[in-house]
């Protein structure tokens, strides 16, 4: 249930449509399997496969963007096109020109698409109107951009903006390491990436390695800055903070797993309980992290 990544966004103005209103908007852009000739299709799908495009618990909402893509490697298309071009050359007595090659490639693609395998990828979105958060469970900015574009397409006048803080993650993480003092409520874990600002981009990584304060200060004095830092919030949630303010490898710790209601036996109730727990914990963590980065800066 828990998101593994958090690409963070803020509501720049109050936004409080009901789950039913959001459902109606998403329904206009719902996912449908692609035809045999479509390379890729996207649309909103049910997070619980129960037909509902918005899974709501209280004011918290969970959405799912589904992407279906045909697996048709360019090397396969190019090989078949090359063979087809050789046949055409033999028939007409001269090599096909650029336009003819382009048409051959399009023809080959159309012939191969119906036989190509399809893969589906679901990307989840958590919306917390009360605390003003919208987070996308995507490891890369490119995938998050896809989701954001579909959100803007489906939800009119969505007041969405990136999170801006008063102290950059790089400056803050570097300061925490150089002073050997983590912000209140957080601890630094045994994974760090330090990178030089020079053209060489010289990089030092610590992975599951004890951190030596003097060694870290030496790297920082030499001009390196922290670009990735593994941390734990209140002994409850571990994560990796990056220089772009994306949060990766989010994981609940044992204290949260023990807190989960073990008396819930119904699968739907369990899902709702887990979602509520995740939303509450992440909202608290994000609030504290924002403060640790100097507070939110209004763009």
From Swiss-Prot:
Q: Where does this polypeptide localize? A: Cytoplasm, Nucleoid
Which Gene Ontology cellular-component terms appear in the entry? bacterial nucleoid; cytoplasm
Query: Molecular function (GO) terms listed?
Result: double-stranded DNA binding
Disulfide cross-links? none
Q: According to its UniProt record, where is this protein mainly located?
A: cytoplasm
Similarity annotation: Belongs to the RdgC family.
Q: What name goes with this protein?
A: Recombination-associated protein RdgC
């Amino acid at each position: 249930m828990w998101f593994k990544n958090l690409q963070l966004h803020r509501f720049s103005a109050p936004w409080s449509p009901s789950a039913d209103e959001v459902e109606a908007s998403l329904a206009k852009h719902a996912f449908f399997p692609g035809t045999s000739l479509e390379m890729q299709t996207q649309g909103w799908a049910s997070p619980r496969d129960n037909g509902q495009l918005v899974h709501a618990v209280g004011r918290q909402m969970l959405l799912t963007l589904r992407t279906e893509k045909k697996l048709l490697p360019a090397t396969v298309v190019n090989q078949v096109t090359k063979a087809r071009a050789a046949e055409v050359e033999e028939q007409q007595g001269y090599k096909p020109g650029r336009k003819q090659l382009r048409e051959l490639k399009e023809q080959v693609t159309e012939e191969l698409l119906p036989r190509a395998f399809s893969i589906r990828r679901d990307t989840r979105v958590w919306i917390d109107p009360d605390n003003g958060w919208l987070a996308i469970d995507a490891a890369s900015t490119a995938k998050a951009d896809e989701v954001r574009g579909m959100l803007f397409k489906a939800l009119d006048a969505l007041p969405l903006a990136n999170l801006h803080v008063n102290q950059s993650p790089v400056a803050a993480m570097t300061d925490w390491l150089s002073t050997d003092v983590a912000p209140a409520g957080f601890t630094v874990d045994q994974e760090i990436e330090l990178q030089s600002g020079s053209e060489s981009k010289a990089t030092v990584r610590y992975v599951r390695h004890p951190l030596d304060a003097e060694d870290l200060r030496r790297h920082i004095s030499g001009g390196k800055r922290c670009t990735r830092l593994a941390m734990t919030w209140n002994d409850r949630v571990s994560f990796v903070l990056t220089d772009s303010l994306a949060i990766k490898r989010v994981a609940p710790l044992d204290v949260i797993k023990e807190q989960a209601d073990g008396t819930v036996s119904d699968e739907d109730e369990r899902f709702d309980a887990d979602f509520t727990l995740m939303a509450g914990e992440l909202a608290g963590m994000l609030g504290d992290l924002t403060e640790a980065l100097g507070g939110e800066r209004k763009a």
